[in-house]
A protein has these predicted regions:
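Substrate-binding pocket helix/loop in short-chain dehydrogenase/reductase
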Residues: 106-107, 114-119, 219
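Residue(s) in the substrate-gating loop at a strand-loop-helix junction
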Residues: 155
C-alpha cells in the first residue's frame, strides 16, 4: 500500500492547508494541544478562551513551531458575545468544541448552583458555539464542495455512568445526542459532525483528582490498557476527524478510553 505524504510527513488527506479552525477552551489542556496539532497540519487556528494570558502562551508556542494562530478572548457562557465573536470571523471551516467543566460530588449533594454551572458550559455553551460556527460555515459559497467539520469533545462518561459524576455524565450524553442529530441534519451541506470521547487524561484539569491515590487506583483498574491517557493520543484523532481523511465519517463518536467502555 502506498501512502501519499504531504508537507511535514502528514499523509496528504490529513493536511488542513487553507482551512480555518476554531478551538474553544483553547488556553490549556486538550484545547491547547489540539490548537498546536491543527496548526502542524496546516490550519489557520483561532484559539478561544476567557483568559488572555493562556491564549498568548498557546499562540506563541504555535508560531514558534512555524504554525499560524490567533487569540480570541471570549467567555463561551456569554451567548451574545460568543455569537458576535464567531459571526465576525472572515471564514470558518473547522470547529473543535471543547470548553467544559466537572464538579465531582454525590448525586444527593448537587446544588442548583453547580447544576446550572455545569449545564451552562457543557450543554448550553456547546450548543451556542456549534450553532454560531455552523452559521458562519454556511456563509461560504463553496461549502458543499469544500466541506466543513465539527468535533465535539465529550468524554467516555457520555457513554457510561459513574458515581459522583451524575451531572457531568448527563451533559456529556446530551452532547453525544447533539452530535448525532447535527451529523444527520448537516450532511446535505457536507458539514460533518463527530465527537471525541476520551478517558481520563494527564492534564491540568485532572491533576487535582489524581492527587487522591484511591481515585487514581479506581481509574487505572477500569482501564484495560492500565494507564492514563496522554494529550497526543487524543489530538491525533481530532485532526483526523477534522481532515479529508474522515470524509465519510459523521454522526458518530470516537471513544479513546483504553478499553473502559468495552467492559
Amino acid at each position: 500500500m502506498t501512502v501519499v505524504s504531504g508537507r511535514d510527513g502528514f499523509p496528504s488527506n490529513l493536511r488542513l492547508d487553507g482551512l480555518t479552525a476554531l478551538v474553544t477552551g483553547g488556553g490549556r489542556g486538550i484545547g491547547a494541544a489540539t490548537a498546536s496539532a491543527l496548526a502542524c497540519a496546516g490550519a489557520q487556528v483561532l484559539v478561544m478562551s476567557r483568559t488572555r494570558s493562556d491564549l498568548d502562551q498557546v499562540v506563541a508556542s504555535v508560531e514558534a513551531s512555524g504554525g499560524k494562530a490567533s487569540a480570541l478572548v471570549c467567555d463561551v457562557t456569554d451567548s451574545v458575545r460568543t455569537r458576535e465573536t464567531i459571526a465576525a470571523l472572515p471564514r470558518l471551516d473547522i470547529l473543535i468544541n471543547n470548553a467544559g467543566i466537572n464538579i465531582p460530588e454525590a448525586f444527593v449533594d448537587v446544588s442548583l448552583e453547580h447544576l446550572d454551572a455545569i449545564i451552562n458550559l457543557n450543554v448550553r455553551a456547546m450548543f451556542v458555539v456549534a450553532q454560531a460556527a455552523v452559521r458562519k460555515m454556511l456563509e461560504f459559497p463553496q461549502r458543499r464542495e469544500v466541506g466543513g467539520a465539527v468535533v465535539n469533545i465529550t468524554s467516555q462518561m457520555g457513554h457510561v455512568g459513574a458515581a459522583r459524576r451524575t451531572v457531568y455524565c448527563m451533559t456529556k450524553h446530551a452532547i453525544e445526542g447533539l452530535t448525532k442529530a447535527m451529523g444527520v441534519e448537516l450532511a446535505p451541506q457536507n458539514i460533518r459532525v463527530n465527537s471525541v470521547a476520551p478517558t481520563f487524561l494527564d492534564t491540568p484539569f485532572t491533576v487535582p483528582f489524581f492527587k487522591d491515590p484511591k481515585f487514581k487506583d479506581w481509574v487505572l483498574q477500569r482501564i484495560p490498557l492500565g494507564r492514563i491517557g496522554q494529550l497526543e493520543e487524543v489530538t491525533g484523532a481530532i485532526v483526523f476527524l477534522a481532515s479529508p481523511a474522515a470524509s465519510l465519517i459523521t454522526g458518530t463518536s470516537l471513544v479513546i478510553d483504553g478499553g473502559w467502555t468495552a467492559q
